[in-house]
């Protein structure tokens, strides 16, 4: 995702690549959280919404609404393609989603160092 974000304006193909990168990163984020919480004895995580809510409750993420917006955007990328929707999602990735992924990664790396 950083490769796309380092560029200025994206053409349509690059924008599609950015969105696909978001989809992959989103899936990786919630499944990593699921694994993290299962390692701590949590067993009631059945999807991304559960994982993000628990992460918010436990202080791993701070911007709960942004993560809920990610769920909506991820669903849109799976079920429809509309140029305006794609542009709006790409803007959200650049402006709010990517920084949240970076914060989550840093938080998990810190926790890993503290417990490892």
What feature does the model see in each segment?
Residues 1-116:
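Solvent-exposed interaction patches of small proteins and small membrane subunits
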């Amino acid at each position: 995702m950083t490769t796309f974000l380092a560029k200025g304006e994206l053409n349509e193909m690059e924008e599609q690549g950015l969105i696909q990168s978001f989809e992959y990163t989103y899936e990786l984020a919630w499944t990593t959280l699921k694994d993290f919480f299962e390692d701590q004895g949590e067993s009631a995580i059945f999807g991304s919404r559960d994982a993000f809510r628990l992460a918010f409750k436990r202080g791993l993420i701070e911007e709960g609404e942004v993560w809920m917006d990610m769920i909506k955007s991820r669903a849109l990328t799976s079920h429809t393609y509309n140029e305006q929707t794609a542009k709006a999602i790409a803007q959200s990735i650049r402006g709010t989603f990517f920084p949240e992924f970076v914060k989550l990664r840093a938080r998990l790396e810190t926790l890993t160092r503290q417990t490892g």
